[in-house]
């Protein structure tokens, strides 16, 4: 991609039209002009009286390298000869009030390691990618009808070196990728990697949207990490925050002394809880900054998806006492998604949205917001509230486990067991479970069994796979020493077997976005807190029966209605002794009894384990078998408008 000479820029392209390559104009670009090598600096500061580039190369002297204003709307530019990659710099901006403030470059692709805040000249071009096979394979698949298991992680606290220092992007190739492959996750979702000054913001309060944080290395190092992920069949999703940004003095806030990237109106500018300000999504220059940024990460870093943070905060104005939709944000999100899918129709655009806004995952040409996935926050909240309840009282909130199926197909959902639920005093997933030590592990195994068999793609935050006991401590790494304890090893073994079963079982994902992929057997047994249901794939024989018991009672010869296959095998039981359970399993092949039950043509009698999930697979169908209504069993149609773009 060539750098566009600023003098040739048509004003309308950046200021009034959709212009999604603004990173080619703005920022610091190593170029040759008039046969002289140097760096061209270009910045947008509409209310600046004067601008300079300052750095070590001119001893931070505001007078030496004054920039030229090349458009009336406030584009400033300067070519400085004979400076090279690696130079640190900032913009010195004289405000309308006569003050001189120092700002990092909004379009810088590299920055100093915190606590330093200067931008760094870096030639981002030149990385040689080796992921053609990944791209080709990705285009052959439909993400809607494939297994998807996402491992959410914080790059700085997944694992640290013995001396407490961080692993680099390149070092994480050897540490993280084999672990993800071993656990058969299809994707990793990394909490924000844009440059940010404060570690404990986790990257959600950024100052450098185009700069991969230098905490872990250079932009090319991150490209290498993504390249290696693709080599091993792992997709990379980034957490991305287009709604708000931090107020640090060197960042975007009051960039030229006046609200530039943020709203002017204080009522809608501020996020008091987060201490951030909202992007002015009604301003064309801001839209071009953000949408160009999304495409920049796609084009330069080969990212496979974004989890768009805080969509609810974007959709609604945060005026006190009001709930009014922000039409700027609505039209921005539609424009963003159209641009992203025009670039890559196989991209993952996931909305982190807790509202009931309709048609979030419906294409824009059908009136939707245009995402293709949405976190199912309602499912997460209901299920965790249910699990935290004492087992003997769960029968009184039975509907929390069934309500999600009333809307499960209204959007394309991802089920998130995310970082938000295991921090700030909320406890880890394991420690949310009531009861004694054994009970906690049994119920976490049960939760995971329900999680992997419920419709929707899957996301789990790091540490959950082996039963992290403490909640997430963002300044420390995970408690890897827990593998020294038997119950955590059992949990880890169970999780790996469960995810492997999920990936090889088409009924658990093939019709995730079609109501024909799910059928309740018994949703109403609140007295015993037992749920049973069927997951169905495209083919008749691609069916699984799932039975979940959310109390500690054991039931012998429990009747479960099933489709009329001759036999069933129990292919997973969370109470198996090899997973730390009590061993109440169904070892023998289960012969169906041809008597209707639960509105099914037949039933089986099984042992239901305490706090257990049992997954049954049909073995053999009867010739000419009929359903209860007398019609022959047939393959269900999977025609649906959901799960498509």
Swiss-Prot record:
Pathway named in the protein's UniProt entry: Glycan biosynthesis; glycogen biosynthesis
CDD domains: AmyAc_Glg_BE, E_set_GBE_prok_N
GO molecular function: 1,4-alpha-glucan branching enzyme activity; cation binding; hydrolase activity, hydrolyzing O-glycosyl compounds
Keyword field contains Membrane: no
GO cellular component, one term: cytosol
Ranges of Polar residues composition bias in the record: 636-645
InterPro entries hit by this protein: A-amylase/branching_C (IPR006048), Branching_enzy (IPR037439), GlgB (IPR006407), GlgB_N_E_set_prok (IPR044143), Glyco_hydro_13_cat_dom (IPR006047), Glyco_hydro_13_N (IPR004193), Glyco_hydro_b (IPR013780), Glycoside_hydrolase_SF (IPR017853)
Keyword Transferase tagged: yes
Function: Catalyzes the formation of the alpha-1,6-glucosidic linkages in glycogen by scission of a 1,4-alpha-linked oligosaccharide from growing alpha-1,4-glucan chains and the subsequent attachment of the oligosaccharide to the alpha-1,6 position.
Chain coiled-coil ranges: none
Species classification: Bacteria, Bacillati, Bacillota, Bacilli, Bacillales
Active site: 309 (nucleophile), 352 (proton donor)
Keywords for this protein: Carbohydrate metabolism, Glycogen biosynthesis, Glycogen metabolism, Glycosyltransferase, Transferase
Gene Ontology terms: biological process: glycogen biosynthetic process
Catalysed reaction, written as an equation: Transfers a segment of a (1->4)-alpha-D-glucan chain to a primary hydroxy group in a similar glucan chain
Protein name: 1,4-alpha-glucan branching enzyme GlgB
The protein's Enzyme Commission number: 2.4.1.18
Assembly and oligomerization: Monomer.
């Amino acid at each position: 991609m060539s750098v566009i000479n600023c003098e040739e820029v048509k004003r309308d392209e950046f200021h009034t039209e959709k212009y999604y390559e603004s990173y080619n104009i703005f920022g610091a670009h190593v170029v040759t002009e008039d046969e002289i090598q140097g760096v061209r600096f270009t910045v947008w500061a509409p209310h600046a009286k004067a601008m300079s580039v300052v750095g070590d190369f001119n001893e931070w002297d505001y007078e030496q390298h004054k920039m030229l204003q090349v458009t009336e709307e406030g584009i400033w530019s300067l070519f400085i000869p004979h400076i090279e990659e690696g130079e640190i710099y900032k913009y010195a901006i004289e405000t309308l009030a006569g003050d001189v403030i120092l700002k990092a470059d909004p379009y810088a692709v590299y920055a100093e390691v915190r606590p330093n805040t200067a931008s760094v000249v870096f030639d981002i071009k030149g990385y040689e990618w080796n992921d053609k096979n990944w791209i080709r394979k990705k285009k052959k698949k439909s993400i809607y009808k494939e297994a998807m298991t996402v491992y959410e992680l914080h790059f700085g606290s997944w694992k640290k070196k013995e001396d407490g220092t961080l692993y680099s992007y390149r070092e994480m190739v050897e540490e993280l990728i084999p672990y993800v492959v071993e656990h058969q996750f299809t994707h990793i979702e990394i909490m924000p990697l844009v440059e940010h000054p404060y570690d404990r913001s986790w990257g959600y309060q950024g100052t450098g949207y185009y700069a991969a944080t230098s905490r872990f290395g250079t932009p090319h190092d991150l490209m290498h990490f993504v390249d290696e992920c693709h080599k091993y069949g792992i997709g990379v999703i980034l957490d991305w925050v287009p709604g708000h940004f931090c107020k640090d003095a060197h960042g975007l806030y009051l960039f030229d002394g006046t609200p530039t990237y943020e709203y002017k109106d204080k009522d809608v500018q501020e996020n008091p809880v987060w201490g951030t300000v909202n992007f002015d999504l009604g301003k064309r220059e801001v839209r071009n900054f953000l949408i160009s940024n999304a495409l920049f990460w796609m084009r330069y870093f080969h990212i496979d998806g974004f989890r768009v943070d805080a969509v609810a905060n974007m959709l609604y104005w945060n005026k006190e006492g009001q709930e009014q939709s922000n039409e700027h944000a609505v039209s921005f999100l539609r424009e963003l998604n159209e641009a992203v899918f025009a670039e890559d129709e196989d991209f993952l655009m996931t909305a982190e949205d807790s509202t009931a806004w309709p048609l979030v995952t419906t294409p824009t040409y059908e009136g939707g917001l245009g995402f293709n996935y949405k976190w199912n926050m309602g499912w997460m909240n209901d299920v965790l509230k249910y699990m935290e309840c004492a087992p003997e009282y769960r029968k009184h909130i039975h509907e929390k486990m069934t309500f999600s199926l009333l809307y499960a197909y209204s959007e394309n959902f991802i089920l998130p067991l995310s970082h938000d639920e295991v921090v700030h005093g909320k406890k880890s997933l394991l420690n949310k479970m009531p009861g004694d030590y054994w009970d906690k592990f049994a119920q976490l195994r049960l939760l995971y069994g329900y999680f992997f068999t419920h419709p929707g793609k899957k996301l789990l935050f790091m540490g959950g796979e082996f039963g992290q006991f403490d909640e997430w401590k963002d300044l420390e790494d995970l408690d890897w020493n827990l593998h020294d304890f038997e119950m955590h090893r059992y949990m880890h073994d169970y999780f790996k077997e469960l995810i492997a079963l999920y990936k090889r079982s088409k009924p658990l994902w093939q019709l995730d976005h079609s109501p024909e992929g799910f059928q309740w057997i018994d949703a109403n047994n609140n007295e015993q807190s037992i749920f049973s249901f069927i997951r169905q794939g495209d083919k008749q024989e691609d069916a699984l029966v799932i039975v979940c018991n959310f109390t500690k009672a054991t039931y012998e010869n429990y009747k479960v209605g099933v489709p009329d296959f001759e036999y069933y095998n129990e292919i997973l039981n969370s109470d198996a002794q090899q997973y730390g359970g009590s061993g109440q399993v169904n070892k023998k092949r289960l012969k169906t009894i041809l008597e209707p039950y639960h509105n099914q043509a037949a039933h089986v009698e099984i042992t239901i384990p305490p706090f257990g999930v049992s997954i049954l697979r049909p073995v053999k169908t009867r010739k000419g078998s009929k359903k209860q209504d007398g019609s022959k069993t047939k393959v269900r149609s999977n025609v649906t408008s959901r799960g498509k773009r």
